[in-house]
C-alpha cells in the first residue's frame, strides 16, 4: 500500500441540476416527475421535423442565479449550441447545450473539511436540455421514456481542484445547499435532480502535469461518489504501478459491488461536432437584468451560518447541520421565537427531528410546542430521556408538552434526598456490580445507573444521579 501514498488524485466534478420550472426548456410540456411514460412529450421535445424551439426565459434566470450564488462572472452575451451524438434516449440525435460561451464562468465556493477551508474553482455553468430515460425490463427488453427529454438542466463544472473523496463530498454538499437556498431546484437525488459526473486522474506527488482521466457518469449520492473515487484512485495507481496504461474512457460505478467498469472510450469535444444552434437567437443580458436577478436571491448559507452563530450562539457544526435544508433552517428560526434555549433546540433537531424526517425535512410539530419542550429541558423540569419520549409522541400526534408533563407526572426528580434513597436501594442488591466497578469495569457503572433510572421510570435527574452514585462508590 506504500505506492498508493506516492500518488495524489486530481478530481473535477460536473454536477447536473434539474431546474424547478413548470415547463420544459424549449416547449410547453410539463416537467412533473413520475408521470406515465411518454405522456409529457410534443413534436418539439421529440425532435420531429419542421418544429422550432423557444427558450424558456426562467431557465436563463435560474442559471444566472446559480452563477451569482457561486461567485461567477455572468456573460452579457452567450449562445446555445448543438452537441451531436447518437444514443437511443436522444430523439433528435443532438442535445442543445452551450459550448464556448456559457452563461456563467470563473466562480468558486469555499468548503470546510478537517484540514480547514479550501477554495474550489468553478469553471463554468451552462444551460442544456436533459435526455430521455432507458427503462430495462426482463420481459419487454429496453424501452424508452421520453418524458425527461427537454427537461431543463444546468451543468456546473468545477476546476480540477479537489484532492480527496472528503473534499469532493464537502463540495457537493455545499453546492447542493447553495442551490437549495437559491430556490432554483429541489435537488432531489432520488428523482435525478442532482447528479454528478466524476473526472479523476492520478499523478505522482509533486508532479504538475495531469494524468489521463476517466469519467464516472451519473452518480446521485455523496456516499457513492466517495466510494467511486476511492475505488478508481486505487485502480489507476495499481494499473500504473503494474506497468499498464490508463485509458481515457467513461466508466460506470456499480453501487452493489462498489467498483467501476469501462463503458466506452471517452469522447473529446471535437467528437461532438459542436456548432451554434441556427434556430435559437443569442442570449443577451443587461446589467439591470443581472442586478434584478441578484436582488431576488435570498440569504445564502454562509450568511445565514454567521447569523446562527452570532445571534443564537450555535457552534459551526450545529449551524451547518441546521442549514442543510432551507425549510429546516426556517423552522429552527420559528422555534427560536418562543424560547431562548437555542442550543437545546439545535440538539432536538440533530438528535430527533433529522432522524424522524429522513431525507427531506418535514416536521409535523408546531414550532411553539418544540420550543416549550426545549424550555422544559433547559429549566431542568424534564430530562433528556423524557424529551426523546415526548417528542416521539408529538411527532405522531402534536400536543402541548407542558400540559402532558403536568398531567402524566413526568417532571424530573431533582430532590437530592429522594435520589440518595434510590441509590442506596440499588446498591443493597448490586454487590457484584459494585465489585466489578471497583475493579475497573466501567460498564458496571452503566448497569448501576440503568437500575437507578429504572426505579424512577427514567425520571431521575441523570447528572445528580451520576454524582451521588460516584460519591457513594
What are these regions (language model features)?
Residues 76-80, 241-250, 287, 307-312, ...:
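Short coil/turn segments at secondary-structure boundaries
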Residues 1-299, 310, 316, 337, ...:
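Basic, nucleic-acid-interacting segments
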Residues 314-338, 342-397:
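Amphipathic alpha-helical "recognition" segments
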Residues 361-371, 375, 381-455:
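Strongly charged, low-complexity linkers/loops
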Residues 423, 435, 467-473:
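A carboxyl-terminal module marker
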